[in-house]
Amino acid sequence: KKPQIKPSAAEFENKKTSRKEKLVARMATKKDLSGVSELNRKLFKDQYRFDSAMNLEWTASRDGQKYLKRRISRSDGFVEVVENSKKDLVAYLAGAIVKRPMYRIKANYAELESIIVEPDYRGANIGSKLLSDFITWCRQNKINYISLLVASQNDPAIKFYKKIGFKPYDLTMRLELSRLPKP
């Protein structure tokens, strides 16, 4: 059985309208697929500035939709959404329990795969709330380590993750061969 995070509500002042509104954080359901897909598309578009190899069509592809459906419905996946008073999704976090790399010590691993908060809702600890709930879910699943990938140039995200307690661990490097002079 999939451990659940209880829905929670909080009042938030929208930067754009300066009005207070109630936000609700809850686990995603299959009914949220289109809203999560749209947020994921926005995340990819935002991340493209750091990584031009991002496939901006992936979210809408069959593989992208299959991935999101599995994360929402399977017990090894975690997708939490935040909705505003109009029932629009304004944030989400997706993560999953992952297999231990064979070269790592025996332990239980999870990966934070994606997180986004709409710009008008940033700065109100929504991302921290989502991450806190993911950590709680990981503890319920007896996870020892959570990892994530972040673009090395994405300073705001790196600062956010470090504030939570994440530390740099592995370094992935890439060489784009088309940029090398031909021999």
Locate predicted features.
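Conserved N-terminal entry element of GNAT/NAT acetyltransferase domains
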Residues: 1-31, 42, 182-183
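Conserved acetyl-CoA-binding loop-helix of GNAT-fold acetyltransferases
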Residues: 114-117, 123-136, 140, 159, ...
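Conserved beta-strand in the GNAT
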Residues: 81, 88-97, 111, 116
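A short helix-loop-beta-strand connector motif used in the catalytic cores of GNAT acetyltransferases and
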Residues: 65-81, 111
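A conserved beta-turn-beta hairpin within the catalytic core of GNAT-like acetyltransferases
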Residues: 99-112, 122, 168-169
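Conserved GNAT acetyl-CoA-binding A-motif
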Residues: 138-149
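Conserved GNAT-fold acetyl-CoA-binding loop/helix
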Residues: 44-68
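Conserved active-site alpha-helix within GNAT-family acetyltransferase domains
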Residues: 128, 152-170, 181
